[in-house]
Amino acid sequence: ATESFAIIPDRLYYVGDNEVAIYLTQADDGTLILLDAGWPASGYQYWRNIEAMGFDPRDIDYILLTHGHGDQYGTGAELDTMIKNAGGDRVVYECYEDTYGYDIYGFPEITGIIEDTPVLNAVDKFYINDTWMEFDGSVRIKPVLTAGHTNGTDSFIFELTDPATNETLTISYLGGYGVNGNTKYDPDNDPTGRGYLRLAFQYGLRYLQQTVEPDYMIPQHTNQYPMLEINKAAEEKGIPFLEAVNRGSYEWVNFLEKRQAVITYEDYYQNWKADPKDEFGTEITVTDAELQTIEAAGPYRREGGTYQITLTDGGRIIQGFNRYMNQTDKLSG
């Protein structure tokens, strides 16, 4: 269990538990938007957290489910029923790809992954990816399909006005934890060709790194980013949450690169330690081949010295990788 708290007072709140991050957004006209529904056994905690922020969970207008895993949609059907029984008129969104599959892309053999009938019955609409969902001018949210964790995981870009300053802030959110068991290629157990999801996951990370420049970022799981620790330190320091986190796209780019590192690189390393052979039984060692850089010969070869490089076709240098998240002096002491 964990306490809820305001990320942007009167606009964006953390109402999840100590593992699954759930966010409640309030528009100026009172519209309430819940991002994900959490574990099926923890609904009481999420609803108490919502009440602690001054809202009635039965007043929620939109439930946005990020993908078809139980820790995201778990309480969705129960919350949907609770709102209906209270006379509420809510809309539940889910990604089409996790609900029904890839038939719309010409691949009917790739089906949806949600098998929970009450959840399937609760879904009202599907996301129109890369299209803004407008909420009264103070809130708008854009779903971005970033498959990989599942067939249809959606990430989200929020544009929210801060009621205290009237400044419009961009908040970015990566859907999905990372590469999981369903995305590992297993030639003996791969009935739906799930191997493509590993590449899709990495593509999604790169796409978000290069196309989204947020003011702040928020995670889907609290072990991806020290959300709760930062908030507790901010409370002890007596400063607002946003003052305790670094502003700008650096944190976002670094966060996405860490998802690449801890999920993919570590996975490869652990597999190699367990069995340093490829699928054909050939032992893999660093002495099997000579390492050579692309600068050694051909069009990329250059003499030593200082060069001015011009990036074309929209290319840009982002940054390197720092394994530490939210390095700041604001919480020292």
Task: Label each residue range with its predicted role.
Residues L12, A41-Y44, E51-W132:
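Active-site HxH/HxHxD metal-binding segment of metal-dependent hydrolases
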